[in-house]
Regions:
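Short Lys/Arg-rich cationic patches that frequently serve as NLS/NoLS or arginine-rich RNA/DNA-binding motifs
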Residues: 497-505
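Surface-exposed amphipathic alpha-helices with a cationic face
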Residues: 34, 197-205, 330, 354-355
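C-terminal accessory segments of extracellular proteins
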Residues: 480-495
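Alpha-amylase-like alpha-glycosidases and glucanotransferases acting on alpha-linked glucans and related
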Residues: 9, 15, 53-190, 194, ...
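Outer-envelope exported proteins of Gram-negative bacteria
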Residues: 44, 210-212, 216, 290, ...
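Catalytic domains of carbohydrate-active enzymes, especially glycoside hydrolases
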Residues: 24-49, 287-288, 434-436
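N-terminal regions that are enriched for targeting/export leaders
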Residues: 1-11, 27
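Conserved, well-ordered alpha-helix/loop/beta-strand core segments that scaffold catalytic motifs
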Residues: 186, 190-219
Length: 505
């Protein structure tokens, strides 16, 4: 069945309190998607972000981002008083997230909520909390990790004293006793996060909207996952990485890309029948309806850079687990529900892996406009319907911003191909050809639908300091844009069957 939808991260939803949350505005967005005839809502990883604010660098592959907890919902639950959070000036400009202000204020407010939760926990909530802790075995290691980070002033676990860094049994046991209350605080945050998330997901599903989630291929070095299961990564006896992930120098980057993530010990993972990945994918498939796996080509082969290098020079290519991993994942978690982010160098070996896995790959229209007209990303050249077409992604500029930075020859080709005369017409033309393509799924962004330029870009890869900040305003979600998208979706045969609307939250 042909489908379509919008890519909009939770953080980019509007509200008064600094960052998008799983509160009222998220439910309103589901209602808007329904009115626009859509069936998909794609988000970025829900993971708790670390320094740099990227959802692709997190303290845990399992833990949700506490910033997405709705403070208004906590007030409704009796855990907060309105004044305790409403009087805070969360941001100077509602268009952009101020992460420094969020960090300074959010956890203070949540400590107040936790205090009331601890005192008043009883009955159904108490049983629900106990069940949550019992059903999530990752929680103990994660909460201890966060408590210890606080105790060490936010320092990476790599800088902790040796017994804790190497997870000496006695040291870990003592830390659990010493920081039990802090661990419970972080468990409370996760309890509230997942409580709100699954209610929102159910509301979306009840209204015919599937959630497309996203998981990074690699873990951050400073994460509970690497600290607790160091044997699964290429680290030395002192838990220092021997190699890190990245991408070699090419025509676009003289020094290549140095991502810095530790690389998996795939031989060890295979010996354990990919237990770690099966657990991760099982969790992700519960969290989302469809899972987009970032940097899928890294499972075919990966570029390993010696730890300590300042650039990506000097790295080497190595074979990844290839289909062996996905064969196990399919057997243990089911066949469907995965999108492969297959952007990059597509070798015959990568094509073989994609064919074996049978996951839909991605087609980004901004990559399509080679003036020869032969690009595999142009809709006329798609060889399979088993793909997802995007007008743009979180890592690219908006269509308008992209167009404004093209050379004159390519601009002319784009205009001729799309049949537009002015740059302002481009975003709508992009959406039009994506929706009318043969791809099974078509996705655009709210930035595209609103016709925004580079000012609305989410992320510029390999840069830090000004990414992941852009947000929508309530005024962006117009009845006019919903009606336009609804009609386009209908004539493109992507509109889902009409269902009776479910009650609002």
């Amino acid at each position: 069945m042909r489908k379509s939808g919008i890519l909009l991260h939770i953080a980019s939803l509007p509200n008064k309190y600094g960052i998008g949350t799983m509160g009222r505005e998220a439910y309103k967005f589901v209602d808007w998607l329904r009115s626009a005839g859509q069936s998909l809502w794609q988000i970025l990883p829900l993971s708790q972000t670390s320094f740099g604010d990227s959802p692709y660098q997190s303290f845990s592959i399992y833990a949700g981002n506490p910033y997405f907890i709705s403070l208004e919902t906590l007030e409704e639950e009796g855990l907060l008083k309105h004044k305790e959070y409403a009087d805070i000036n969360w941001c100077k400009d509602p268009r952009y997230i101020d992460y420094a202000t969020m960090y300074e204020n959010f956890y203070k407010v949540m400590r107040l909520a936790f205090g009331r939760f601890s005192k008043g926990r009883n009955g159904n909530v108490s049983e629900e909390y106990k069940a949550f802790v019992a059903e999530n075995p990752w929680l103990e290691n994660y909460t201890l990790f966060m408590a210890l980070k606080d105790a060490h002033g936010g320092k990476s676990w790599c800088e902790w004293e040796t017994p804790l860094r190497l997870r000496d049994v006695t040291a870990v046991y003592s830390a659990k006793k010493k920081y039990a209350k802090d661990m419970e605080f972080y468990a409370f945050l996760q309890f509230e996060f997942f409580r709100q998330w699954y209610k929102l997901k159910k509301y979306a599903n009840d209204n015919g909207i599937q959630i497309i989630g996203d998981i990074p291929i690699y873990c951050a070095l400073d994460s509970a996952d690497v600290w607790c299961e160091s044997q699964l990564f290429q680290l030395d006896r002192d838990r220092v990485p021997t190699v890190v992930a990245g991408f070699p120098p090419d025509a676009f980057s003289e020094d290549g890309q140095l991502w810095g993530n530790p690389i998996y010990d795939w031989d060890r993972m295979k010996q354990e029948n990919y237990r770690w990945w099966v657990g991760r994918m099982s969790f992700a498939k519960k969290l989302y309806d469809i899972v987009r796996i970032d940097h899928f080509i890294g499972f075919n082969s990966y570029y390993a850079i010696p730890f300590g290098n300042k650039t990506a020079h000097g790295g080497e290519w190595h074979d990844g687990p290839k289909y062996d991993l996905f064969n196990v994942i399919k057997r243990e978690t089911g066949k469907g529900g995965i999108i492969a982010e297959d952007l990059g160098i597509i070798t015959p070996s990568v094509r073989k892996l994609l064919k074996q896995a049978a996951y839909p790959g991605m087609k980004v229209l901004q990559f399509a406009f080679d003036p020869t007209g032969k690009s595999e990303y142009l809709p006329q050249n798609y060889t399979s319907q088993n793909c997802v077409v995007y007008t743009s992604t979180h890592d690219s500029d908006t269509a308008l911003g992209w167009f404004n930075n093209l050379d004159r020859k390519t601009k002319q080709f784009v205009k001729e191909y799309l049949g537009v005369r002015h740059a302002a017409e481009l975003p709508e033309a992009f959406i039009d050809i994506a929706w009318k393509s043969t791809a099974d799924m078509a996705m655009t962004t709210m930035q595209e639908l609103c016709g925004f330029g580079t000012e609305a870009r989410i992320n510029v890869p390999s840069t830090i300091g000004n990414n992941w900040r852009w947000r929508t305003l309530e005024s962006d979600f117009t009845a006019q844009s919903a009606a336009y998208l609804d009609r386009l979706t209908e004539i493109s045969n992507r509109k889902p069957p009409v269902k009776k609307s479910r009650k609002k939250r």
